[in-house]
Amino acid sequence: MTVRLREKYQKEVVPALMEEFKFKSIMQVPRLVKIVVNVGVGEAVQNAKAIEAAVNDLATITGQKPVVTRAKKSVASFKLRAGMPIGAMVTLRGDRMYDFLDRLCSLALPRIRDFRGVSRSSFDGRGNYSLGLREQIVFPDIDYDKIDKIRGLEVAIVTSAPNDEQAYALLKRLGMPFRD
């Protein structure tokens, strides 16, 4: 079973990008490399159960078991010691990556209050795109009654595009709702 977005990429996006940027080879066409989803859980310093809830939410959203991230340095003002769990992260590749991006663009982003599109200025200059979501409940997979706290999450989309222009063209054709 192929993922809907991967099929769209191969059948529609690749030929369109080859024509737009005058690529000679299919291998020059930008593609998605990975999507990294991260949740920072600052309250995990006082409440150890907060990290478990964040891990469960992230696993539900992405369909993959997250890695618990730990503090690299101790910070006295935050009452934080090196090695304490302070977040969770998932790296998505392959079919799961395309499935997640499809659900993000078609289901989650339109459910955000007062949503007019994502910013074009969030590219990093090397063809990667980052966006933050204020609440995890925009994903339909999350049961509103079972969440303990509304948490935000960061999504980093890594592409093989050498510049922002090509990455924008790729994401726009894959269905990312940009604010124009």
UniProtKB/Swiss-Prot annotation:
PROSITE patterns: RIBOSOMAL_L5. The keyword tRNA-binding applies. GO terms for cellular component: cytosolic large ribosomal subunit. GO terms for molecular function: RNA binding; rRNA binding; structural constituent of ribosome; tRNA binding. Pfam families: Ribosomal_L5, Ribosomal_L5_C. One of its GO terms (biological process) is translation. Keywords: Ribonucleoprotein, Ribosomal protein, RNA-binding, rRNA-binding, tRNA-binding. InterPro entries: Ribosomal_uL5, Ribosomal_uL5_bac-type, Ribosomal_uL5_C, Ribosomal_uL5_CS, Ribosomal_uL5_dom_sf, Ribosomal_uL5_N. Part of the 50S ribosomal subunit; part of the 5S rRNA/L5/L18/L25 subcomplex. Contacts the 5S rRNA and the P site tRNA. Forms a bridge to the 30S subunit in the 70S ribosome. PANTHER family: 60S RIBOSOMAL PROTEIN L11-RELATED (PTHR11994). Belongs to the universal ribosomal protein uL5 family. This is one of the proteins that bind and probably mediate the attachment of the 5S RNA into the large ribosomal subunit, where it forms part of the central protuberance. In the 70S ribosome it contacts protein S13 of the 30S subunit (bridge B1b), connecting the 2 subunits; this bridge is implicated in subunit movement. Contacts the P site tRNA; the 5S rRNA and some of its associated proteins might help stabilize positioning of ribosome-bound tRNAs. This is Large ribosomal subunit protein uL5. It comes from Chloroflexus aurantiacus (strain ATCC 29366 / DSM 635 / J-10-fl). The lineage of its organism: Bacteria, Bacillati, Chloroflexota, Chloroflexia, Chloroflexales.
